[in-house]
Amino acid sequence: MLLYIVIIVACIISKLVPNEYWAIHLFFIIMIFMVYMYEKLDIHQKYQFWNYTMSGLSGHNVQITCKCY
């Protein structure tokens, strides 16, 4: 479901934003890929995915604890 929302928003943005702003289009393509990969994971792998992503973006060791019941 989240993937479809991101794809719809990306399509709307691609129609509204001129082609000169290719970075915005690239951002949404990357977001679609990230959401697609995220939805293929199970609940425990999702927390590891965000730990890795956030630590890569911030440059610091980020730990999100999983409270899966």
Curated annotation (Swiss-Prot):
Keywords: Glycoprotein, Host membrane, Membrane, Transmembrane, Transmembrane helix
Superkingdom as given in the UniProt entry: Viruses
Membrane topology qualifier: Single-pass membrane protein
Glycosylated residues (UniProt): N51
Intervals, Extracellular compartment: 37-69
Keyword presence, Glycoprotein: yes
Cytoplasmic compartment residues: 1-15
Transmembrane segments: 16-36
Annotated compartments: Host membrane
Gene Ontology cellular-component terms listed: host cell membrane; membrane
Similarity field: Belongs to the asfivirus X69R family.
Name under which the protein is recorded: Uncharacterized membrane protein X69R
